[in-house]
Structures are given as structure tokens and as C-alpha cells.
Amino acid sequence: MRIALGIQYDGAAFCGWQAQPHGKTVQDRLEHALAEFARVPLHTTVAGRTDTGVHGLGQVVHFDTDLDREVFSWVRGTNAFLPSTVAVQWAKPMPETFHARFSAFERTYYYALYVHPVRSPMLAGRAGWIHTPLDDDAMRAAAAHLIGEHDFSSFRSSECQSKTPVKHLYQIDVRRVGHFVHFRFRANAFLHHMVRNLMGCLVAVGRGRYPADWLADVLAGRDRNLAAPTFMADGLYLAHVGYPAEFAVPPAQLGSVPWSSVWADLDPQS
């Protein structure tokens, strides 16, 4: 039997998703909890590996098992062995044709950026921060140059293992609410560090360091050295993974973050 799980986690507490020898990753903690509950080792396959400090609101995994358990028991039983910084949100039996990574046709990330002269300790690890004003319209104009199917080599890390740098970026939204600027990135898939590298460039434009059309030149150059430095991970959230309707994957629970009303208005499935 194939089981899919919806996972939420506080990325600030972990060294990324992928299992490591030191055991301080989300995958390590999840698989340990599953093994404790099931009394047998279970290997998970994830929709998308997140970096150190990146949060998960709508992460999806699957695993195969011969155990006959009530579906919701996978939620309650696994959570009983997880730290407070990780929680299974739902469980669902899936056909063998479902694959957490390869069945997904899109991913959505949100970035919450606190714009204020003084940093807030209450937002540490939860939102990015910049102390200088930003020009929202300039960032929107710059983002428009990135929409579509392109070679995003200028925005991939040197450690990226993707077979191709060509991705289709469907949408970038920029919305200001009070002292926050909220960004939404939706694409068929993302390269390693791609969203954080895009954020670094958008913020550089917003600060007036470059004109909006500079980003078109960076994209065309296909050279990581042309882009701005990688932006901090603190405010980045994997919000949604899109799957074909036939799998009826439950939606992510966005209400678990303070600015959920802003994000809920930006329907990740639109």
C-alpha cells in the first residue's frame, strides 16, 4: 500500500530536508517517527527537498508499507514521536501510480519579508528582514522579465543536481501589507537556491541598486556571477505542491502562520 502524508515543519530547527549522517534533518526525524510508530523502517520520498532554514507548509511525501492501519492513525501515531517543530497534517492512501515528486506538476513558494529600520526578534527565523525601503513597482517590473520558460542558470547554485536549468516560471506576485512585502513564486519546478537567488535580485532592484530591466540581462547571461547574492532562508515557505486532480491531494493548511490571510488570498492553485 502506498501512503501519502502532508507535512509541516519549522525549517529553522533543521539542517534542511534530506537525511544526513548527523540526523538533524526533517527527513531523519520523520522517518525515525514512522519507524517508532510502525515498528519497521519506512523510507519516504519527498515532493521537494528544502534547504536549511526553509519552512514547509505544504510538503508531501509518500512511502510504501504492508501494514494495515487506519488511515488517520498514521497522523496521530507518527506525530506522537515527532518534535514540536514537525507535524503530519494528513494521510491518504494512494494508487501505485502516485509519486510525491514525479507526479507533481507545480510548486508554490511564499516569501515573507519584513521591511523596517529595526529587526524584530519575534520574527527571527520566520521572516526575512531588510532595513531599507523597497520600491514594489520596480520589483514587479523586474519580475515580469522572468515569467515563462527559460534557462535559469543564473539563479541556480553550484551544488544543483537538476538535469536541466530550464524551468517554467508561471507567476511572481509582490504584495505589501503594512511593514511586510509578500512574494509568491509558482513554477513547474525550481532549481537549488533558485527562489532565494531570485529574491536577492528582486530586493536589489527594489533598493534601487539596479533598474528593473537588469534582471532580463541577468537571465539572458546564464551566469550565476551576474546575479545578486543568495537571500536569507528565514522567510521562505514551501506552500503548495500541485498534483493532478485524480489524486485528490488535500490542500496545505496555510492558517498556521500569522500572515495566512494574505497568502490564502493568493490561491496557490489559481
UniProtKB/Swiss-Prot annotation:
GO terms for molecular function: RNA binding; tRNA pseudouridine(38-40) synthase activity. Keywords: Isomerase, tRNA processing. It comes from the Bacteria. It is an enzyme of class 5 (isomerase). Pfam families: PseudoU_synth_1. Substrate binds at Y109. GO terms for biological process: tRNA pseudouridine synthesis. Its EC number is 5.4.99.12. The active site is at D51. The keyword Isomerase applies. It catalyses: uridine(38/39/40) in tRNA = pseudouridine(38/39/40) in tRNA. Formation of pseudouridine at positions 38, 39 and 40 in the anticodon stem and loop of transfer RNAs. Belongs to the tRNA pseudouridine synthase TruA family. Homodimer. This is tRNA pseudouridine synthase A. It comes from Burkholderia lata (strain ATCC 17760 / DSM 23089 / LMG 22485 / NCIMB 9086 / R18194 / 383). The gene is truA.
